[in-house]
């Protein structure tokens, strides 16, 4: 990743790191780069989630886009995948989403989509970064009729909702509990599930600019678990702040994570002959139980680096149509080009309705192994070379021998901090504690910063 762009756009504390000045420049330089091959006036969609800083950054970003002659369609509050969908179907030059996803309200972010609805390629991001770092802004400064125009486009939300409904099935007789995280899904999820004829109960639907992801949503599903039990709902659905991920809750109040959601949808598609190459794309963080369930079902798997952009890259390069992460990013390429929490929720409910099975029955086919992750602070120069240390390599090999295939160890560096992540999965909590703690002790002794 570059100096400004991470794996999911530009992020930082709003008005401190991600300032209006930077947002203006991102609009100006990003709009210029993405419109270079347009023969007509470029059209760009802009949306945001419900953070208090969203309107400030939106105004600055739009000013930058207008300054290079872009026709801006202002969508207001909308889910990230809604931007991706509209860019493709309305033939726009690009889309921009202002959100920090599952992060707290003080953070925000800006991410771009190309005219194909996919996140920008690395070379495009680097081109924008080069303009940001240039000593002088030498881009054209049109005036009068050369300036961009601004169009309020609330119809975008309705079009996205209509699209979501067309992917589903009649949910009459089903009760669905929704947690919209006081975020972008708060403007759409209720209407979508009512249009599908579900009975609904909703929490996290009163955003005030400061409460996005605060004790609600996919990273805090506890309130949803209680709501499911209180209402007797058939399933619960928790989205994050920009609604690009989903965590589900079964009718007993148990969490159903991204691994299980992918398995349920993947098995359904596979049995109908609709799973491309009979393969699901996942990452090294997916649970061993998920891998074993796929093997038992005869479904292939392709492993991508951690991060939904890398899952998408693997899907695009090899022609797969289903992939995702344990965290709840699920990409169903037949419908959209990025993770879409509401779309995934609708497909999950569709499988339940068409199979006549409860979510707990469907999820039971994946036995989730206990998992433990420990972060160890190490010298930054050593985090990528840990496996070169004989004592560390030897203890990992010893633990893997003891597992005899009934467990998994993953040791990897953090992409952003001087940390080494030690993760293990095993059939029992006691065993997983033993494996992780044994390896972590050796890592701390050999390269830990606290020595």
Swiss-Prot record:
Gene3D superfamilies xrefs: Alpha-D-Glucose-1,6-Bisphosphate, subunit A, domain 3 (3.40.120.10), Alpha-D-phosphohexomutase, C-terminal domain (3.30.310.50)
Bridged cysteine pairs (disulfide): none
PTM comment, free text: Activated by phosphorylation.
Active site residues per record: 101
GO biological process: carbohydrate metabolic process; peptidoglycan biosynthetic process; UDP-N-acetylglucosamine biosynthetic process
Molecular function in Gene Ontology: magnesium ion binding; phosphoglucosamine mutase activity; phosphomannomutase activity
Class of enzymatic activity (EC top level): isomerase
Domain of life: Bacteria
Entry EC number(s): 5.4.2.10
List of residues binding Mg(2+): 101, 240, 242, 244
Catalysed reaction, written as an equation: alpha-D-glucosamine 1-phosphate = D-glucosamine 6-phosphate
Required cofactor names: Mg(2+)
Methyltransferase is among the record's keywords: no
List of residues that carry Phosphoserine: 101
UniProt cofactor note: Binds 1 Mg(2+) ion per subunit.
HAMAP family in the cross-refs: GlmM_B
Record's function text: Catalyzes the conversion of glucosamine-6-phosphate to glucosamine-1-phosphate.
Name of the protein in question: Phosphoglucosamine mutase
UniProt source species: Streptococcus pyogenes serotype M18 (strain MGAS8232)
Source lineage: Bacteria, Bacillati, Bacillota, Bacilli, Lactobacillales
